[in-house]
Each structure stands twice: as structure tokens, then as C-alpha cells.
A protein has these predicted regions:
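Short, C-terminally biased terminal segments at protein or domain edges
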Residues: 1-123
Length: 123
């Protein structure tokens, strides 16, 4: 997958998060979870774009780590929406699956970048 394709997936994820947040009930819990999810679910795309423009490999890894952290937080909020039955699981399942896939992709990218850094540090 190219970085442009990953950016598109992250932007699509953010757009889907926005739609989910807008569909949450207007309750104290719905507003709280919605606020948290909109922040964590929309930040991975710009954080990944920043990583692509990193000034060093260490900066790249750091920015990817922030992206992964936000995706993992989003995953927790999505799971809570499912557990509390705020929205039907069939509606949330695809979003949760995409979040898991994005977490795996970013985590693998971090591992690869760290290995490359170790190789360059040894030479």
C-alpha cells in the first residue's frame, strides 16, 4: 500500500467516524463519547501526513506512534459504543474492523522504520 492510499483510508475512516458521532444519542454519555471519538478518530490522517514529512527517521517513528495511539483510543470508544448499544453492532462492526486494520498497518510501519533506523545506526 502506498502512503497516498493509506492517507485516503485514514481520511475515509475520519469521515465515517464523523457520521457515527453525528448518529450518537444526544445524552450525556453520547456527547462525551462523541467528543472523544471525533478527536481521536480524525487525528490519525493529519498525523500520518505529518509523519510523511518528518525531518528524521526518529521524528517519523514518533509521529506514527501518535497516529497509532489515536487509532487505539478510537478503537476503545468504538467498542464502548457497541457495548452500551448506543448504535447497532452491525453498523459499528465495519468501522471497528477498519480501525483494527489501520492499527496493524501503522504498527507494522513503526516496526519497519525502527529496524531501518537500527541498520543505519550500525553502519
Amino acid at each position: 500500500m502506498t502512503s497516498d492510499e493509506l492517507v485516503e483510508r485514514l481520511i475515509d475512516f475520519a469521515a465515517r467516524v464523523g457520521k457515527v458521532v453525528d448518529a450518537l444519542p444526544d445524552t450525556r454519555m453520547g456527547r462525551h463519547i462523541g467528543g472523544q471519538l471525533v478527536r481521536s478518530g480524525t487525528s490519525p490522517a493529519p498525523n500520518y501526513e505529518e509523519a510523511c514529512a518528518a525531518e528524521s527517521r526518529a521524528d517519523f517513528v514518533h509521529k506514527l506512534s501518535i497516529c497509532l495511539k489515536e487509532l487505539r483510543e478510537s478503537r476503545s470508544w468504538i467498542r464502548l459504543i457497541i457495548k452500551t448499544e448506543m448504535l447497532p453492532e452491525h453498523r459499528m462492526g465495519e468501522l471497528l474492523d477498519e480501525c483494527n486494520q489501520l492499527c496493524n498497518i501503522i504498527a507494522r510501519s513503526i516496526v519497519t522504520a525502527k529496524k531501518r533506523k537500527e541498520k543505519t545506526d550500525k553502519h
